[in-house]
């Protein structure tokens, strides 16, 4: 099985230290937004193969037919902290989104069968399940994601251009 079977390209993720500030600057300077902001608290957390509870802040904005995601570490230790220390702010990953929980779990199993490294993964019941996979061929991270937007709470904040939330 090919890893992207049934997946669609969902978003491009960028790591930042100040999520609200970055969203505001992108809205003001580049017209990107509005940004829907959440604190994400996975109930299952693995970092480099070991349990490691973490939370993070995420902001999403529609850009044309795609989405930009800003991520900032919040609590606990995660690959977000490591990346910021080693590389600073900037591009982090490209996301492939799967239509069902079973589909993303099969993709994660396929990644493991292929011997690829999952450096971080997390999930919360049937709301979301994600994994960051190292694709050595392009020296980059690819996120495998299932997300049920109907089960997300409303955004904690909306930053920029308009007061109505954009698509997730």
Give names to the regions the model predicted.
Residues 33-83, 128-151:
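Conserved short beta-strand elements that form part of the metal-binding/catalytic scaffold
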Residues 20-39, 85-89, 100-124:
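Extended intrinsically disordered, low-complexity coil regions enriched in Ser, Thr, Gly, Ala
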Residues 2-3, 9-17, 59-64, 69, 83-102, 108-168:
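Vicinal oxygen chelate
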Residues 20-25, 70-74, 95:
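Short acidic/polar alpha-helix capping motifs at helix-coil junctions
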Residues 1-52:
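Long, hydrophobic N-terminal alpha-helical segment
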Residues 23-29, 81-87, 154-164:
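Surface-exposed flexible segments
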């Amino acid at each position: 099985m090919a890893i992207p079977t049934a997946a669609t390209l969902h978003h491009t993720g960028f790591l930042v230290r100040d999520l609200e500030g970055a969203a505001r600057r992108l809205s003001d300077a580049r017209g990107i937004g509005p940004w829907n902001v959440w604190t994400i608290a996975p109930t299952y957390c693995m970092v480099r193969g070991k349990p490691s509870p973490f939370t993070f802040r995420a902001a999403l904005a529609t850009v044309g037919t795609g989405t930009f995601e800003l991520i900032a570490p919040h609590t606990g230790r995660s690959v977000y902290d490591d990346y910021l220390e080693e590389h600073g702010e900037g591009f982090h990953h490209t996301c492939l989104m799967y239509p069902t929980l079973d589909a993303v779990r099969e993709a994660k199993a396929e990644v493991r069968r292929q011997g690829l490294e999952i450096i971080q993964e997390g999930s919360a019941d049937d709301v979301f399940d994600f994994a960051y996979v190292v694709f050595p061929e392009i020296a980059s991270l690819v996120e495998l994601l299932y997300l049920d937007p109907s089960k997300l709470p409303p955004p904690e904040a909306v930053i920029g251009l308009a007061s109505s939330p954009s698509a997730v």
